[in-house]
Design a protein with these regions (language model features):
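Anionic, Ser/Thr-rich low-complexity intrinsically disordered regions
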Residues: 1-72
Length: 72
């Protein structure tokens, strides 16, 4: 893969990580509000876990691309 392609993919991966951080923070606020108000939190907890799992994948991809770029 050439440098330009890796740089484009890395920029996209960075955007995914940033967006994931925002989604996780928002979902945590939703969960806190549900808990505070005495509502069922099962679905909110499941959704938070989905976001956390996705974020792990985004971070892995970003780190892989950083390593690829450093190896050029």
């Amino acid at each position: 893969m050439d440098r330009a392609v890796i740089e484009r993919r890395l920029a996209e991966a960075e955007r995914h990580v940033t967006l994931g951080e925002k989604k996780i923070a928002n979902q945590r606020r939703v969960l806190e509000n549900l808990l505070r108000d005495g509502h069922d939190t099962a679905e909110a907890e499941r959704q938070l876990q989905v976001f956390l799992d996705s974020q792990d994948l985004h971070i892995e991809e970003r780190n892989r691309l950083r390593a690829d770029l450093a190896g050029l």
